[in-house]
């Protein structure tokens, strides 16, 4: 009995963990070049609301302005 119960613990932990992660994921949008958009955070807030976070992903060149924001209820998570 103890062995059966312990073999169920790990799958249950993973199910709970993945259920919580899905609820906390947001949406993401790429706005353009950080060379053109000088205030990436401000632009994200103006487009997606006060809970949006913007940052410049400097993967090369002038970088890319990326926004992370809460998904609308009708839009699926990524």
From Swiss-Prot:
GO cellular component terms, A-Z:
extracellular region
Which terms does the UniProt entry file under GO BP? defense response to fungus; killing of cells of another organism
Show the disulfide pairing. 27-71, 34-56, 40-65, 44-67
Q: Which UniProt keywords apply?
A: Antimicrobial, Disulfide bond, Fungicide, Plant defense, Secreted, Signal
Q: Subcellular localization, per the record?
A: Secreted
Q: According to its UniProt record, where is this protein mainly located?
A: secreted
Which protein family is named in the record?
Belongs to the DEFL family.
Q: Tell me the protein's name.
A: Defensin-like protein 171
Report the source organism.
Arabidopsis thaliana
